[in-house]
Each structure stands twice: as C-alpha cells, then as structure tokens.
Amino acid sequence: MKLLANIFLSGLAILACVSCSKDEDPVLPLEGAKLSVAVKASGTATKAYNPNDVNELEGEAYINNLAVVVFNETGTELLGYKWEALSGAEHSAIIADVPTTKAVRARIIVLANVPRDLLSTVSTYDEFQTRLVDLSSQSQTNLTMSSQVIVTKSALSEEDNYLGYTDLGDQNVDGISDPILLTRVAARIDLVNISTRFAGTPFAGREVRIDAVGIYNMKTKSYYFSEADWGETEAPDAVRNSEDTSFEDLLVNDGTSISNTPFVHYVMENMKSDDHTMIAVKATLRGNSSYQDHTKIFTAVINAGGLQNGYDHNFIRRNYVYRLRIYFDGESFDNIPVTPDPGPGPDPEPEVDTNLNIAVQVVGWGPVMQHPVID
C-alpha cells in the first residue's frame, strides 16, 4: 500500500436504468448504462491544526464537487459526463445517473474540485488530455484531484455495473474492488524552521530579520489527470515567480529559532523543466554600533537531491509536501563597517546568494481514507 496520501474514492456503480436528468445534466439518448458514484470523505485521525507535525492542513481533503467523464475505449467518443456539487468534506455523497450512450468498453476519469463547465467543452479523450488547471484556482479548501484513467476490459453491462465496491468483490467490473484513488494535482511547500548558527563566527550575538519569502520558477499550470495512478501531470512552460510574502519583526538568533511554519505555498508539478522551483528568502543581518545592516536574497532549489537523500524523485512532484528547514551561518553575510558619512544615494539592491543552507524533508500528504458507501 502506498504510504503517501491519496484520497480514496469509495465506489463506482453503473446502473442500467433510465430516468429524467436534472436540468444541469447533459441530455443524451440512454441506450447504455448510467453511472453512479458513491463517496465518503473523512479526515485524518485528528483534525487538530499543528503545522509542525501534521502534513495535511484543515480543508485539503475537501471534495466540494465531483465530476465523472466517460469515453468509449479508444477515447474517440464521449459517452457521458456529469458534474455535481457536494455538501461537505466529511459527508457521504452520491453523484448519480451519469448518462452514457452505449454499454461498451469504457474509458472513465473521476475528478474533484473542477469548474462546472469543464466537461461541457470536451468531446474526445485526446482533447481532454490537453486541458490545463491553473494554480490560481487552487486553495487550501479547494484542491483539484483526479483518478487514474480507468479502461474497462469488459463492456459495461445493461444491467447494474460496479467498480471499486469492496464488499461486492468480483461483481465489480473487471473484478476491480479496491477503492478508486483521487490524487491532488498540486504540491505544497512549507518553510517550517529558520535558525542561525553564529556561535564562534564574526556574527556571534547578532540576529537576522526575515524580510520576505517567495517561490521562484514555480509551475502555474498542470494537466488535470494522468493515465497512471499518481502519474505525471506536468505541463510545459508556465513558469514564473510568486509574489513575495513580507514579514515584520520576524527575528531569529542562536537562542531563538522560528519554528511555527511562517510560510506555506502551493505549486504545480515541476520535475522536467530546466527552471527548477526554488525558495527565495530575503534576510537582513542586523547591524550594531560597528557594522551596518546587510541584506541578501538567498535561494535554493527545492529537493534537488531527493533521490540521493532516499526519496523517490528530485524536484517537485504532485501530491507531496516539501518541508524546508533553513539556517544562516558565518558564511551567509558580510560584516560591513559603519560608514561615518554615508552618501545620499539609495541603498544598493540586495545581492542574490544561491548558497542558502537548506534541508528538505519530503513527506506524504494525508492519508485520507474513504470507506465505501452503498445505498
């Protein structure tokens, strides 16, 4: 079983009945089956918010809406789809009566937290593969998720069909009784700790002010889904820097570290680009009677050595949390003597230092387990 988090979609039942569609549903001739999806969304064992030791933040498992799209086996024909709002993250819900026009071998994709009109613009599987989700639509309580592509080996029956219902065992389509997994398309970056190591250096007794934190080279777009379970969704290009998050009086010294996770940011998958996603920290070594303030912007690629450190990937992969710990030492700044008569000109722009001392922990997001609900 995978240790890292997925959201477990409890079951998929295909019913061979004909009934009236709701106004918002597509009106299709019902010669084949109808698709019903039963979901139970439950949280982690505890919902206490403690960003230092809980990987999943409150709301990150919410399933606000659920969408199902069904193509024929080759993906050349759209057989049916439906989008439906759900009542909340920790409530059972059913998306019922997704119409399909034919009882044939099918290609099925399940998504959560997607725009209502997404599927209405799609007519083939290849076309749907090109659709992109934007980072701006992602938030702590509305993270897009998707299943792998489910291609049935047998045709959908005109009788009832089930997929992912544990209690039904071999009665499921192709005998697939394990719950269907929904995986987030975003990743999360947490700056969990900032410290100094100035003892025995020229900066002993000094403190550092954290002025701002941002993300450089973050991917802002992703594909909605992958054919494989937890597969790649990285989109080309779409790389930019985030807006900085500014701080006031955020101070750190050898006696007082910052360990309350002052910075959290979502990004999209970025494993193949030459522009690797980086953390950027603007920090100032506080001056004293002898030395001036010295401000620099420190950067480091996130998870550049993931494989070397025992993780299963380098850089940024969807549905992971990257917990960053940084520190400043005797090599981080310069001692700049106080100038008796400083000139009237503006302060120089901070230099960029690519040698930020950083440790990266790659952790699972969740887990959140959904149990079957069969009505």
UniProtKB/Swiss-Prot annotation:
Maturation propeptide residues: 17-47
Lipid-binding residues (covalent, S-diacylglycerol cysteine): C17
Lineage top rank: taxon: Bacteria
Record keyword tRNA processing present: no
Signal sequence region: 1-16
UniProt entry keywords in alphabetical sequence: Cell outer membrane, Fimbrium, Lipoprotein, Membrane, Palmitate, Signal
Subcellular location: Fimbrium; Cell outer membrane
Pfam families: Fim1C-like_C (PF21489), P_gingi_FimA (PF06321)
Family annotation (Gene3D superfamilies): 2.60.40.2580, 2.60.40.3690
GO cellular component, one term: cell outer membrane
Entry keyword Lipoprotein: yes
Lipidation (N-palmitoyl cysteine): C17
Family as reported in the entry's similarity comment: Belongs to the bacteroidetes fimbrillin superfamily. FimA/Mfa1 family.
Oligomer status and interactors: May be part of the fimbrial tip.
Function statement: Probably a component of the fimbrium tip. Fimbriae are filamentous appendages on the cell surface that mediate cell adhesion and biofilm formation.
Full protein name: Putative fimbrium tip subunit Fim1C
Organism: Parabacteroides distasonis (strain ATCC 8503 / DSM 20701 / CIP 104284 / JCM 5825 / NCTC 11152)
